[in-house]
Structures are given as C-alpha cells and as structure tokens.
C-alpha cells in the first residue's frame, strides 16, 4: 500500500502570491519534459491520474499542489527543456519557479526526475545549480529504469552517483533507480520523502523474503 495513497489535488498556482500560506512542509518534483515526472508522482500516490500525464511535452506550466494524508504537500513543477515552448512560457517558468525554489521556506527538498537513458543533461544541472545554494536536499530518481538491462541500470546509477559525489555534502544528495511501469524503487523513494516531510513509516507485515529493490540509493 503506497505511503502517499491519500494524496488529492488541491490547487494550481500561477503566481507566487497564490501559494498556500500554511507552514506545513512540501516536496517539489522537477524534471525535463517527458522524463516521467507526472508518472512518478502517480506511482508514489498509487493513483493513475492524480498528476496529469501529457503526451504533449511542456503542457504543464503552473505549480500543481497535492495534499497528503499527513497535511503535507507534493508540488508538481512544470517540465523544462521543451524546445518548442513559446518564449512567454519559458519566461513564466523562470519567473515563477526560480523564486519558488530559492525562497519558499516550506520547501523541504527537491526530487529531480531524470530519464535514465539521458541523465544529467545541461538543463538538469542548471536547475540543480540553481537549487543547491538553498542548502536543502536533492533526491534524483533515474526514471524508466525498466528500459535498460540490469547491467546498464547499474552502470548509469554508478555514473550519476560519481558526478553527484563531486558536489560535496553527501548527506544532502541521493540517487536511486525508479520505474513507474514496474513499480520499482517506490519504497526507497518513500523513505526519503517521509524523512523530509517528517512522516512516520509504519512497519509493514513481512510476508516473504525482503525485496532486493534497486542497487542502492544513498551516496557512499
């Protein structure tokens, strides 16, 4: 049973003045257009259409807030990097998302979703460089891991971990494999997000041997 299964849509925010005013913690999800961001949110919530999955990249252009059972929030940020996005939309992204990421006191951490076949693009790194000065944690989901063999998954994971290790502050940064299609990596992601949101994870009944899951998330 997903930890965040009671997530429900709350509101869409197009201007910073419309952000929720309560002081509860929230986690933001960012990623390139079509990297699997909305699918990852839906998978973590155990829902099919909580976050809208568009076949048209760059469609989502506002902050979408989802309320969790514990009163905390998931925030779905607009996908970035879609080349055909009009200049006005790109400017809106920078005008809304930049201040949100740098100044939102309630933001507990940032989840960056990257297609495992094309991780650490220039735009991914620009976003991360934008966020790192806040001193808040970043968790990278290498999505669509089912598209690669186990050997290539491990190779990609090691490569991204090696680059992340150069950032220093190892406790702030973590990486894992994730597949919305196979529901792989869900519990691993839940543990990270629960710690950020200060949510207790109830022990699950052990009905068999432990799931080996993906090969590691924490930085060495």
Swiss-Prot record:
InterPro entries: G_ENGB_dom (IPR030393), GTP-bd (IPR006073), GTP-bd_ribosome_bio_YsxC (IPR019987), P-loop_NTPase (IPR027417)
One Gene Ontology MF term: metal ion binding
Domain EngB-type G: 23-199
Residues making up the signal peptide according to the UniProt record: none
GO biological process, one term: division septum assembly
Biological function: Necessary for normal cell division and for the maintenance of normal septation.
Record family assignment: Belongs to the TRAFAC class TrmE-Era-EngA-EngB-Septin-like GTPase superfamily. EngB GTPase family.
Protein name (Swiss-Prot/TrEMBL): Probable GTP-binding protein EngB
